[in-house]
Amino acid sequence: MTDATVPTFDLAELREGLHQEEFRHCLREKGVFYLKGTGLPAEADHASGREIAVDFFDHGTEAEKKAVMTPIPTIRRGYAGLESESTAQITNTGKYTDYSMSYSMGTADNLFPSAEFEKAWEDYFARMYRASQDVARQVLTSVGAEPEVGMDAFLDCEPLLRLRYFPEVPEDRVAEEQPLRMAPHYDLSIVTLIHQTPCANGFVSLQVEVDGSYVDIPAQPGAVLVFCGAVATLVADGAIKAPKHHVAAPGADKRVGSSRTSSVFFLRPNGDFRFSVPRARECGFDVSIPAETATFDDWIGGNYINIRKTAAAR
């Protein structure tokens, strides 16, 4: 019988070496789990970073938003407007846009609309970074993976924090018209930590593929959601799964009250991380780079350009 549940682990227990067999099985077969005991901010701290961003989405002027849109096409920084991106385009699964808007920051080249915004996000970023490094260490160590540069150097990297706001969908984006708010994809990260807020009407929008079927992954109080990314798969030589996931659209009967947010922290390697292109393809990743080896910058830079080109041309 297929087990389609997403398990929950406690970080303190994993540090003590408990539940390792179950954890390795989860990493190999699912690549997704809830995690408690991370030491991440309490809900009020998550809310401070989230609410200041959503307030900017709702009340920032067009000029203010334009001022914090990055001119660099190969990175994600600052504001990205509603339907300005298309995950479907870069995954070759359609032409529809992501029905969301977002704000992103990294370790450099950031754009902030105010000093208050900057302070809230820098504090939040630092806490999420520390937690994601701890989680990644447990994930890689559990399967015996050792990065070529050493664990500490590998995890001293180039992460990205992105707050996505999914407003209520309009009538032409309900599930009967377009089933997804965001297309299926795997993450280009080592691990991804997600703190999501539920839809007010109870609809579960985030779903992950388990054994060929998509299952709901609702917000779980007191826990973050962890996706293992494609980089973890490569470092572990296939011993860790990078699961596909998508964001489903509500049906017409669930349209009202379907807004939600997702605070997503991508622990990504440094841009010079090098990998085998043929091995990446063997692991199921769509890498079109015409070379035997490539860097992470090669891989992700093209994705960022393509995600914007299509949306702008829609």
UniProtKB/Swiss-Prot annotation:
It catalyses: penicillin N + 2-oxoglutarate + O2 = deacetoxycephalosporin C + succinate + CO2 + H2O. It comes from the Bacteria. Its cofactor is Fe cation; L-ascorbate. It holds the Pfam family 2OG-FeII_Oxy. Pathway: Antibiotic biosynthesis; cephalosporin C biosynthesis. GO terms for biological process: antibiotic biosynthetic process. One of its GO terms (molecular function) is L-ascorbic acid binding. Keywords: Antibiotic biosynthesis, Iron, Oxidoreductase, Vitamin C. SUPFAM superfamilies: Clavaminate synthase-like. Residues 156-269 form the Fe2OG dioxygenase domain. The keyword Coiled coil does not apply. Its EC number is 1.14.20.1. Coiled coil: none annotated. Belongs to the iron/ascorbate-dependent oxidoreductase family. Catalyzes the step from penicillin N to deacetoxy-cephalosporin C. This is Deacetoxycephalosporin C synthase. It comes from Amycolatopsis lactamdurans (Nocardia lactamdurans). The gene is cefE.
